[in-house]
Amino acid sequence: MSMSVNEKGICYLPDLGSSFTEDAPRPPVPGEEGDLVSSDGRQYNHSFYSSKSDSLKNEASIATPRRPDLDLGYEPEGSASPTPPYLKWAESLHSLLDDQDGIHLFRTFLKQEECADMLDFWFACSGFRKQEANDGNEKMLKLAKAIYKKYILDNNGIVSRQIKPATKSFIKDCVTKLHIDPAMFDQAQTEIQTMMEENTYPLFLKSDIYLEYTRTGGESPKLFSDQSSVSGNGKVLPGYLPTVIEDVEWRCDQEEEQIAESDPTPSNRLTQKLPLETVPQRVANSKRYQDNREYRHASWREPVNPYYVNSGYALAPATSANDSEQQSMSSDADTLSLTDSSVDGVPPYRYRKPHRREIHESAKVNGRVPLPHIPRTNRIPKDIHVEPEKFAAELISRLEGVLREREAQEKLEERLKRVRLEEEGDDADISTGPSLANHRVPPAVHVQHYGGRYSEMSYNGLQLRDAHEENPESILDEHVQRVMKTPGCQSPGTGRHSPKSRSPDGLPAGKIPGLMMPLSGGQGKHQARQGPKGEAAHLHHHKHIHHTHYAAAGKPKEQAEAEAARMHGGFAWNTEQHHYGPKSRNYADGMSVGPNTMDPMGYSSKGSTLSKRPVRKGEDGRNFEMREPLPADDMERNQKILQWMMEGEKEAGRYKRGPYGSISGPKKAQGHEPARPSSVERLGAVHPWVTAQLRNNVQPSHPFIQDPTMPPNPAPNPLTQLEEARRRLEEERRKSGTLQAKQRHKNMKKQPCENITVAYYFRGEPIPYRTSVKGRIVTLGQFKELLTKKGSYKYYFKKVSYEFDCGVVFEEVREDDAILPIFEEKIIGKVEKVD
């Protein structure tokens, strides 16, 4: 029976005055609902658009349809078009496998990809699980063996490659041991299903086979069997609203003309020209359960059409969807757009909470949309997790650097503080000390050895400064002083000094150069702080005075004056010209510090006794015999040796100056006479010229008047200097070895107080028990107290033994007072049950 277009239109929109079907193309104009149908049943479509025809260009081409499961609470008259089966296939893999057409199409796709065995194996496992127990074990066993041989035994097959080794091993054991269980293939089936859901199933939805099937509308019989045709020509009602062309009014009779003019292709095919007109208004966002790998759909949404997923017209990406949902959650945004509501888009109060809950769920689902990865702008540092050993080594090195910096800063502050204290002490001592007028110095000697500007300098003009360890002169002085302190080369009168007292600058602590010498007669002793490197002119002045009185101790005044005049008048300021005494073989004599040449204090080494005792008769002539000057080659060689020794001492002085105490005060030095000259006492007066002598190889100018009759000193022997340096290095090595031995002995004494680790295996358990016991000696009785389970056991302990090839044995210990053996700083035992 054929129906007219008007009758079809009436059937299509039965009673527009009372209610509206979901397929209504436009909402009616308010107030004109009753004028939609005439008395003869003819529909006047112009009333739908009479008031809005001018605004169609700016409005969407389709209206928001009403679904029966929206928040309206009732189902409108009429029914929605059924969802085609091929669209349900996109919901989940189970939806695809529940349809015969879907299985056939999916198998075709898998054959093209050469992995159809995965689908066959999945169905084989499902059929095996559905086998009833009463079918007999023999039939189940044959079926299990067939599945195992065809799909799992072949390691090159697609199914065998996707199944985990543990699962294959389990199935093999079940088959070989004849333990047939209906669920023995469940794990393998789950793994294959996971593989299909993650790889082959998404590829199938994007494949040309499936997209072509959806474009042609499919040939599934289910689509036609559940609905009857309402038209005489057998055409099916479309599942979606027809396409509405812009700027043209839609009329019901247009559909018949379009159907007649179109090809046999169904009218609900998906076109790429106007995709937005046919896209589902509510796209289902699937949420997959993690336990059974199923999809759950919101009850009020339709599944997404795969055509639009892969055709370039996909919906907004996940980030955009999330932003939209967050905006909806943070405000009462219009998300429904129901134009016929009194309050546009705002749901009633009783539906607001469920609606908000659905929005939250939608936001969570959108966060897992499988779209291309968007790189993060703020990345976690790659080295946030470092190996503990590397981290500890780097941390220790940095902490050691910080510790060295702090120690250097503390030393610098201590040195500055010491200099300030010395300056304050010098001011006090100089102001209260006796004047130079009290010294018994002949005026003639004073005038003879000093110029006008030196004689005018007062005692208060003395400037003392701290010696710097990088200064070559101070390093050389320190080395010479250490050589002179050697026990085998003691000078006469060693009992009157403390040889171990030493300041950080290489000078004897409490010994003040040139200002603490014993005076002749009833004179007192001058006190002053130590000046490591005094100004040359000032130190010359005072040292000469004290030397004169010290050398003249116990002599008549005339004899002392004559000796002083002869000594200081005979300074020969030539390069490496020294005077050796009858027993002179000390390193200091080779370093230009002989008592008759460069040492105005009169101190010398072993063989030089002029400054420490009265000169015996006959010694004078022997000590002052004339010598020939050295040739230029010998002087140059001696200069190189001296410079080499100074550089070596510069490096050694950096590590050997710290452990000694600070400069002693004046009280500590009272009543002590130095038997060895300090560095300033020996070289303080010639520092300004020693460096120039090494650099320029010329005679420096000096304020002293040279005595042409003063004989030059012989050159030092280089072999003697090297032998002395070697002897000093060996002595330092012996001292360091003694300190290391003492440290090791001290550590060995501390070891018995440490704890020891005890580990034991209890009755064959693979994991040992570990504990710690105080002390290094543990007996079997103490070990038994550690056991939580009491009983009759045998005890074996690991020890080193070369009786067997392995090098270790487990020895049984029975006595409670027996000491347990220690193996690699641990006690390792085994506790076995007595049979």
Curated annotation (Swiss-Prot):
GO BP annotations listed: cell development; determination of left/right symmetry; dorsal/ventral axis specification; dorsal/ventral pattern formation; embryonic eye morphogenesis; eye development; fin regeneration; forebrain anterior/posterior pattern specification
GO molecular function: beta-catenin binding; I-SMAD binding; identical protein binding; molecular adaptor activity; protein homodimerization activity; protein kinase binding; ubiquitin protein ligase binding
InterPro entries: Axin-like (IPR043581), Axin_b-cat-bd (IPR014936), Axin_TNKS-bd (IPR032101), DIX (IPR001158), DIX_dom_sf (IPR038207), RGS (IPR016137), RGS_sf (IPR036305), RGS_subdom1/3 (IPR024066)
Nucleus in keyword set: yes
Region annotation Disordered: where it falls in the sequence: 16-60, 318-349, 485-530, 602-627
Entry comment on modification after translation: ADP-ribosylated by tankyrase tnks and tnks2. Poly-ADP-ribosylated protein is recognized by rnf146, followed by ubiquitination at 'Lys-48' and subsequent activation of the Wnt signaling pathway. Ubiquitinated by rnf146 when poly-ADP-ribosylated, leading to its degradation and subsequent activation of the Wnt signaling pathway.
Bias (Basic and acidic residues) ranges: 616-627
Gene Ontology CC: beta-catenin destruction complex; cytoplasm; nucleus; plasma membrane
Subcellular location: Cytoplasm; Nucleus; Membrane; Cell membrane
Location of region: Interaction with GSK3B: 351-436
Region Interaction with beta-catenin: start-end pairs: 437-512
Top-level taxon of the source organism: Eukaryota
Compositional bias (Low complexity): 328-344
Ranges annotated as biased composition (Polar residues): 40-53
One Pfam family here: Axin_b-cat_bind
Alphabetical list of Gene3D superfamilies matching this protein: 1.10.196.10, 2.40.240.130, Regulator of G-protein Signalling 4, domain 2
Keywords for the protein's UniProt record, in alphabetical order: ADP-ribosylation, Cell membrane, Cytoplasm, Developmental protein, Membrane, Nucleus, Phosphoprotein, Ubl conjugation, Wnt signaling pathway
DIX domain boundaries: 753-835
Start and end residues of each RGS domain: 92-214
Function: Component of the beta-catenin destruction complex required for regulating ctnnb1 levels through phosphorylation and ubiquitination, and modulating Wnt-signaling. Controls dorsoventral patterning via two opposing effects: down-regulates ctnnb1 to inhibit the Wnt signaling pathway and ventralize embryos, but also dorsalizes embryos by activating a Wnt-independent JNK signaling pathway.
Notes on the domains: The DIX domain mediates interaction with dixdc1.
Subunit details: Homodimer. Interacts with dixdc1. Interacts with hwa; leading to promote the tankyrase-mediated degradation of axin1.
Protein name per UniProt: Axin-1
Lineage: Eukaryota, Metazoa, Chordata, Craniata, Vertebrata
Gene from which the chain derives: axin1
